[in-house]
Amino acid sequence: MKGNAKVIESLNEILTMELSGINQYFIHSKLCESWGFERLADKIREESLSEMKHAEQVIDRILHLEGVPNVQRLDKIKIGEKVSEQLKADLDLEVAAISRFNKAIALAVEVGDNGSREMLAAMLTSEEAHLHWLDSQLELIKQIGESNYLAQQVHKPE
């Protein structure tokens, strides 16, 4: 099915963001793991894997629309040197992602590409949930202090 060129480019922008998220979340997960924050590392790794599933869906959609997925392009990866910096960098990435998703959804609606719209809307819900989680973690750090927050992140939940 030949897709709209603007939608394909928009999907490639989403793909760039998802691939960047995979890398940023993965390195943050590995850093947390190396610092002994296993519980937090597991949660961040889950987010990296979620982004990978999103990237796969976007690639499949681009191919369905007879486009070429651009897997070579990445946004700048922001690596936090401490947990609060990581969470803030990830929050910034999610805010940008939500903006891109909303623009891509609006374009899909405009050109009548309901398949892309539906896929993007489902992904947007996931991105919004991640944003809420990040916001909550940063608020916890603010309220109880980073050392108390990190003490809760040492062991995996049973």
Residue ranges, per PLM feature:
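Iron-associated oxidoreductase/ferritin-like identity signal
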Residues: M1-E158
